[in-house]
C-alpha cells in the first residue's frame, strides 16, 4: 500500500479548507462593501436634507450652526467613502495595483477631522450652557458658533495640507520621520477630541441625573448624547487606521482585513446624525408623531423642554405658511 496516500489526502483536505475560508472571506468583504455603499447613499441623502433645511428654510441658532457644519463635513466624508467602497468592491473581482486617489484621501482626512471637531464643540458648548446659563444666554458673543466652526475648518485644513505637502509633495520616502511625526500629531489631536467629547458628555449625564440642580432633559441634549455615542463607538477606528497606515508606509490596503469593518463603521458614523435627528424629532410625549421634515428637525435641535413644544411648532408652522404665501405670490 502506498504510504503517501494519507499525506495526499491531508493535503487535499487542507487545500479545500483554505479555499473555503478564502471564498467565505471574499463573500463577507463583498457584502460589507455593498452595505457600505448603501449606508453612504442613505447618509448623503440625509445630510443633504439637513443642509438644505438649516441653510435655507430655518432660522439658525448657536447649535444649528454647529449641526450645519457637521452635516457638511459628513457629506464630504461620505462622498469619498463611496469612492473607497467602490474601489474595494472592484478589487473583489479584479485586482488593481493603484493607490487610493490622492484627492479623495485628503478630503477624507479634512472631513473626518472637521466632523469630530464639530461634534466635540457642540458637546462642550452645551455643557457650558448648562454650567453657566446666565453668562451663556446674556454675555456670550453672538457669532461665537460661526467663529469656532471657521477656526475648526481652518485647523483641519492646515493639518490636511501639511500631511499632503510633507508626505506626498516632498516625497514620503525621504521624509518618513516628518510624515510619521505629523501622523502622531493628528492622532494626538484626535485623542484630545475624544477625551473632551467623552468627559463633557459624562459631565452632562452627571448634571442631569445626579446634580444638586438637575438640568431638564431637552431634545437637543438627547440628540447630542446619541450623536456623541455613535462617534465614540464608530468614529475612532478610522483615526487608528490612519495612524497604522502611515506606520506601514502607505500600504494599498490599510489595516489589512479590518479595512472593510472600519469603512463600514465610519459610514455609519457619518450618516447617524440625520437619522438621530429624525428619531428624536419624531418623538413627542413618548410617542411617535409625524410632521414635516422641517418641524422634525426643529424639534430635534430644540433647547427648551418638551412642554414648550407647542410654541415651537406654532412658530415653525407660521414661518412655513409665510413661505408658502411668498412662493404662491411669485
Curated annotation (Swiss-Prot):
Gene3D superfamilies: Rhodopsin 7-helix transmembrane proteins
Main location: membrane
Subcellular location: Membrane
InterPro entries: GPCR_Rhodpsn, GPCR_Rhodpsn_7TM, MRGPCRFAMILY
Residue ranges of the TM segments: 34-54, 63-83, 102-122, 147-167, 178-198, 220-240, 261-281
Matches recorded under Pfam families: 7tm_1 (PF00001)
Cytoplasmic side: 55-62, 123-146, 199-219, 282-330
Coiled-coil region: none
Region (Disordered): 302-330
Biased composition (Acidic residues): 304-330
Membrane topology qualifier: Multi-pass membrane protein
One Gene Ontology cellular component annotation held by this UniProt entry: membrane
One of the record's GO molecular function terms: G protein-coupled receptor activity
Glycosylated position list: 16
Topological domain spans for side Extracellular: 1-33, 84-101, 168-177, 241-260
Keywords: G-protein coupled receptor, Glycoprotein, Membrane, Receptor, Transducer, Transmembrane, Transmembrane helix
Chain's role: Orphan receptor. Probably involved in the function of nociceptive neurons. May regulate nociceptor function and/or development, including the sensation or modulation of pain.
Family under the similarity heading: Belongs to the G-protein coupled receptor 1 family. Mas subfamily.
Protein name, entry field: Mas-related G-protein coupled receptor member B8
Source organism phylogeny: Eukaryota, Metazoa, Chordata, Craniata, Vertebrata
Amino acid at each position: 500500500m502506498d504510504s503517501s496516500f494519507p499525506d495526499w489526502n491531508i493535503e487535499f483536505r487542507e487545500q479545500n479548507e483554505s479555499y473555503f475560508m478564502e471564498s467565505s472571506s471574499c463573500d463577507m468583504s463583498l457584502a460589507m462593501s455593498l452595505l457600505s455603499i448603501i449606508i453612504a447613499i442613505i447618509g448623503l441623502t440625509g445630510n443633504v436634507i439637513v443642509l438644505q433645511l438649516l441653510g435655507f428654510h430655518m432660522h439658525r441658532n448657536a447649535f444649528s450652526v454647529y449641526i450645519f457644519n457637521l452635516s457638511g463635513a459628513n457629506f464630504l466624508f461620505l462622498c469619498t467613502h463611496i469612492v473607497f467602497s467602490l474601489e474595494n468592491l472592484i478589487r473583489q473581482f479584479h485586482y488593481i495595483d493603484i493607490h487610493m486617489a490622492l484627492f479623495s484621501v485628503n478630503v477624507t482626512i479634512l472631513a473626518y477631522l472637521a466632523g469630530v471637531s464639530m461634534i466635540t464643540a457642540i458637546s462642550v458648548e452645551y455643557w457650558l450652557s448648562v454650567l453657566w446659563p446666565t453668562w451663556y444666554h446674556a454675555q456670550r458673543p453672538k457669532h461665537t458658533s460661526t467663529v469656532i466652526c471657521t477656526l475648526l475648518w481652518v485647523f483641519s485644513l492646515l493639518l490636511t495640507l501639511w500631511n499632503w505637502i510633507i508626505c506626498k509633495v516632498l516625497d514620503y520616502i525621504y521624509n518618513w520621520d516628518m510624515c510619521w511625526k505629523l501622523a502622531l500629531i493628528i492622532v494626538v489631536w484626535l485623542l484630545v477630541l475624544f477625551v473632551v467629547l467623552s468627559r463633557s458628555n459624562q459631565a452632562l449625564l452627571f448634571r442631569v441625573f445626579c446634580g444638586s440642580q438637575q438640568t431638564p432633559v431637552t431634545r437637543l441634549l438627547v440628540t447630542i448624547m446619541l450623536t456623541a455615542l455613535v462617534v465614540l463607538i464608530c468614529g475612532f477606528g478610522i483615526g487608528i487606521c490612519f495612524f497604522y497606515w502611515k506606520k506601514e508606509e502607505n500600504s494599498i490596503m490599510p489595516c489589512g482585513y479590518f479595512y472593510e469593518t472600519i469603512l463600514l463603521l465610519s459610514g455609519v458614523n457619518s450618516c447617524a446624525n440625520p437619522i438621530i435627528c429624525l428619531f428624536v424629532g419624531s418623538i413627542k410625549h413618548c410617542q411617535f408623531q409625524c410632521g414635516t421634515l422641517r418641524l422634525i428637525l426643529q424639534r430635534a435641535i430644540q433647547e427648551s423642554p418638551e412642554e414648550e413644544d407647542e410654541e415651537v411648532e406654532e412658530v415653525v408652522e407660521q414661518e412655513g405658511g409665510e413661505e408658502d404665501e411668498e412662493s404662491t405670490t411669485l
